[in-house]
From Swiss-Prot:
Pfam families: CENP-T_C. Residues 17-21 bind DNA. It comes from Blastobotrys adeninivorans. The gene is ahsb4. The nucleosome is a histone octamer containing two molecules each of H2A, H2B, H3 and H4 assembled in one H3-H4 heterotetramer and two H2A-H2B heterodimers. The octamer wraps approximately 147 bp of DNA. Glutarylation at Lys-92 (H4K91glu) destabilizes nucleosomes by promoting dissociation of the H2A-H2B dimers from nucleosomes. The keyword Kinase does not apply. The modification N6-methyllysine is found at K6, K9, K13. Coiled coil: none annotated. This is Histone H4.
Length: 103
């Protein structure tokens, strides 16, 4: 009998990833109105046109560092799923403690 059995931890055959999404510059998904709403929440009244690209680049570097740390926690625990606690611990490691998600 082939397959992974009940545990699902084995290597198995792999199989084809049929619906693998092509990753392009997804940072453009953070739209101009979304950035404007975040700025409004922070109390900003007028926004320069140059702010949008700068905000996207800063957000991208911040998320890359948090995700890198969260994935490191996940790999250390020998898991494949990043949990909310991994993100909480990654943020805490960077000095940005987040409350309300356990830990």
């Amino acid at each position: 009998m082939s397959g992974r059995g009940k545990g699902g931890k084995g290597l198995g055959k792999g199989g084809a990833k049929r619906h693998r999404k092509i990753l392009r510059d997804n940072i453009q998904g953070i739209t101009k109105p979304a950035i404007r709403r975040l700025a409004r929440r922070g109390g900003v009244k007028r926004i320069s046109a140059l702010i949008y690209e700068e905000t996207r680049s800063v957000l991208k570097t911040f998320l890359e560092s948090v995700i890198r740390d969260a994935v490191t926690y996940t790999e250390h625990a020998k898991r494949k799923t990043v949990t909310s606690l991994d993100v909480v611990y990654a943020l805490k490691r960077q000095g940005r403690t987040l409350y309300g998600f356990g830990g």
